Structures are given as C-alpha cells and as structure tokens.
A protein has these predicted regions:
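A short, surface-exposed loop/turn module that caps and links secondary-structure elements
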Residues: 20-46
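Arg/Lys-rich, positively charged N-terminal/basic patches that mediate binding to nucleic acids
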Residues: 1-15
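A generic signature of intrinsically disordered, low-complexity regions enriched in glycine/proline
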Residues: 14-17, 21-24, 84-85
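Enriched for short, Lys/Arg-rich terminal
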Residues: 39, 46-87
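Compositionally biased amphipathic helical and low-complexity segments enriched in hydrophobic
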Residues: 15, 22, 43, 75-78
C-alpha cells in the first residue's frame, strides 16, 4: 500500500510542478503515470494510473470544454479499482 501512496504523492507533485493542464499533459511523466482524458460521458475527467488495478480520477476546476492553458487547478475526485481486475 505504501507504493500506491508514494505514487499518488508523485502524481500530486507532478501536478503542482505544472503551470497549467497543457504543461501537465505535455510532460513525459504524464505518460509514465498514465494521465489521460476519459472518453464518452466521462470526458470531463482525467485519470492517472496508480497501479494495474487502481486509477485516480482527476477533474480540472473550470467549465467543460476546458481551455488547457487556462486550467491551473485540479481536484482529486476518487480512487477507483472496480473496473480493472486484479492488480
């Protein structure tokens, strides 16, 4: 469990080090952490990979559709492990 907590802290630090959502998404660490926008009804949400089973849901503060340059604040919504099987 400590590994997952450390990963969440690393993702939080990456977000804090990014000046806006665009810089976060362009950062190569975003690929390592699997930060990506959801599709369909959840397209307002971004997720980050905590491990093979657990995803962190992240929502930009602002109105959708987002201007990725203007978004400077994100909130952690929840941690989800129900759709990814054994991790």
């Amino acid at each position: 469990m400590q590994k997952e907590i450390d990963r969440i802290k690393d993702i939080e630090n990456l977000i804090l080090d990014s000046t806006n959502l665009k810089m976060l998404l362009l950062n190569p660490l975003s690929i390592i952490y699997g930060i990506e926008q959801k599709k369909g009804d959840l397209r307002e949400i971004y997720t980050a990979k905590i491990n093979n089973k657990i995803r962190l849901y992240i929502k930009p503060i602002g109105k959708f559709p987002y201007n990725v340059i203007e978004i400077t604040e994100l909130e952690f919504l929840k941690i989800d492990n129900k759709h990814y099987g054994d991790g």
